[in-house]
């Protein structure tokens, strides 16, 4: 079999297809590179691994530098990934070739599936996906959430909260770090913050005022989750988790439920974000609407 000519013809056809069918070019790229990867895999088994380098030299000369040895090896990796996972090209969650290039170095199957789903559902660019992988997003999920994802069980709002939350300090001096600074850093990159506590969030207000008796209290951050149809109270603490923090946030949650929430919305939830966890405090928290996580400064 003349593997080289077949590979070359697939790549030429793909380039021509992209010029007239721009809408479907990402899918066609993936299928073309998968088929090239399959041929490279078979050629390597027949002639040895060095054949890939030989093919790349010829392809660079005839079709351009984009088909160098490194790229061809990625195509071969793509085929091996599909083969190993026993995916059909039709049923696999097809994201872009660029996104697959970000995922190829990952070895863990559960992690691969997580990032593929993330890219597919959120229409992530390669740059955005790279950022999420680099932040070790999967590793920051709870073991309970990972098990749910593996067994395809439904996840709830708590399952999507990462631990720890990474807060960008923008290289500012944090010698005298306090809750006000923590809130400021979060607000400066609110989109990244909301991504780390799940999806479907909309920002309402910081320092949200509520009147308790004759005195105003202020909620650090008030969000709304469109997917779960509920308000979300966020309280920020720069210390270890304490029992009084739970009492405080429950008071705010109850206020929202009584005075703001409509009848067709779910009960308000609360998330305490603190410097250090204390599992013993949460053991005696009877309210399953209260969650906690920690933060680290980047």
Set out the residue ranges of the language-model regions:
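Basic, low-complexity intrinsically disordered segments
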Residues: 1-298
């Amino acid at each position: 079999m003349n593997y080289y000519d077949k590979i070359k013809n697939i790549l030429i056809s793909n380039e021509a297809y992209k010029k007239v069918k721009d809408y479907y070019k990402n899918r066609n790229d993936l299928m073309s590179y998968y088929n090239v990867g399959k041929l490279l895999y078979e050629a390597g088994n027949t002639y040895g691994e060095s054949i890939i380098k030989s093919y790349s030299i010829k392809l660079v000369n005839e079709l351009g530098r984009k088909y160098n040895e490194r790229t061809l090896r990625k195509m071969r990796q793509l085929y091996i990934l599909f083969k190993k996972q026993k995916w059909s090209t039709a049923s696999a969650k097809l994201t872009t070739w660029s996104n697959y290039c970000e995922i190829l170095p990952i070895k863990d199957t559960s992690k691969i599936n997580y990032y593929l789903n993330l890219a597919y559902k959120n229409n992530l660019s390669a740059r955005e996906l790279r950022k999420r992988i680099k932040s070790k997003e999967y590793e920051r999920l709870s073991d309970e959430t990972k098990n749910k994802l593996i067994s395809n069980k439904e996840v709830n709002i708590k399952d999507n909260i990462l631990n720890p939350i990474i807060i960008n300090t923008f290289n500012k001096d944090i010698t005298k770090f306090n809750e006000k600074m923590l809130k400021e850093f979060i607000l400066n990159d609110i989109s990244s913050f909301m991504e780390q506590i799940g999806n479907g969030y909309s920002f309402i207000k910081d320092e949200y005022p509520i009147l308790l008796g004759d005195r105003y209290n202020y909620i650090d951050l008030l969000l709304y989750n469109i997917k779960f149809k509920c308000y979300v109270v966020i309280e920020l603490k720069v210390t270890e988790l304490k029992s009084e923090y739970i009492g405080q946030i429950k008071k705010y949650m109850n206020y929202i439920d009584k005075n703001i929430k409509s009848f067709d919305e779910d009960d308000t939830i609360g998330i305490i974000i603190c410097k250090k966890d204390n599992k013993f405090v949460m053991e005696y928290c009877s309210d399953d609407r209260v969650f906690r996580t920690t933060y680290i400064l980047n």
